[in-house]
């Protein structure tokens, strides 16, 4: 099975990097074939082109319409703030896979 690409975008990067680490650990544990990467929101239009799903950190939720416009054929969603706040790697991974 080909790996799916889950790309997270945010403004700061620190908490998203931690979330990516937790998501990767859960993907490995449950053998979910994904590649998970984090980028600054300024690269959404460029990097998002190769993603299977694009997730935005809650702090840039206001950018959702703009990024959906840049990536009209991609699922683009805002990460649930509760899952993001708890750095719930499994919860965010499940939501990402469901969106693909």
Locate each region found by the language model:
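Conserved hydrophobic residues forming the short capping helix/wall of the S-adenosyl-L-methionine
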Residues: 27, 68-71
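N-terminal glycine-rich "phosphate-gripper" loop used for MgATP/nucleotide binding
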Residues: 53-61
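Short, surface-exposed alpha-helical segments at coil->helix boundaries
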Residues: 17-20, 61-65
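Conserved active-site segments centered on acidic
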Residues: 2-43
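Short acidic active-site motifs
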Residues: 42-44, 63, 88
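Alpha-helix C-terminal capping/helix-to-coil transition sites in glycosyltransferase folds
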Residues: 49-50
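Structural signal for conserved beta-strand scaffold positions within catalytic alpha/beta enzyme cores
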Residues: 38, 56, 78-80
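Ser/Thr/Gly-rich flexible loops in soluble cytosolic domains mediating phosphotransfer, phosphorylation
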Residues: 5, 75-100
């Amino acid at each position: 099975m080909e790996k799916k690409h889950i790309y997270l975008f945010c403004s700061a990067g620190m908490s998203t990097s931690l979330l990516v680490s937790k998501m990767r650990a859960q993907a490995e544990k449950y053998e979910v074939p994904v590649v998970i990467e984090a980028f600054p929101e300024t690269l959404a239009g460029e990097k998002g082109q190769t993603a299977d799903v694009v997730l935005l950190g809650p702090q840039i939720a206001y950018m959702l319409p703009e990024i959906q416009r840049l990536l009209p054929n991609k699922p683009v969603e805002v990460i649930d703030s509760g899952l993001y706040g708890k750095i719930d790697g499994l919860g965010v991974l499940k939501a990402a896979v469901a969106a693909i």
